[in-house]
């Protein structure tokens, strides 16, 4: 089973495209929709939904996958639920760049301070990170500097922030999920 979390633009047709691409490596792909506007509520909702999906699944190695803001949540929720994560251009600093787009971006900072201490150290090797060399929205070098001590980073020369086409990374995701 692969659980897919969308980014800030939940209505983008690219979400459906990514779900369809993921079905090439696992026919059981679940799309979890969340508000994106209320971080504390989103965290509780996502934690409950993902925990329920993982509990009901017969897959011995489920994976959570997300793009942008969905990558932010996938890393954290995947860690808390004990499943591997594949994240594309994760928005690691939403409290800096979501001002004016959501009601309380400062809640992300609060979530960060209340999260398990050194969670990335405890999650080491359980997350596969895909970063665009030309993201266009986020600073990929900053993300790589933060994440590379803990996770494998895969650089993409073609895609931009929304990572419209993930098909050329599917076999790597499949191998990561299975190991």
Curated annotation (Swiss-Prot):
Any Pfam family: UPF0227
InterPro entries: AB_hydrolase_fold, UPF0227, UPF0227/Esterase_YqiA
Family matches, as Gene3D superfamilies: alpha/beta hydrolase (3.40.50.1820)
Family: Belongs to the UPF0227 family.
Protein name in UniProt: UPF0227 protein PM0825
Organism, as annotated: Pasteurella multocida (strain Pm70)
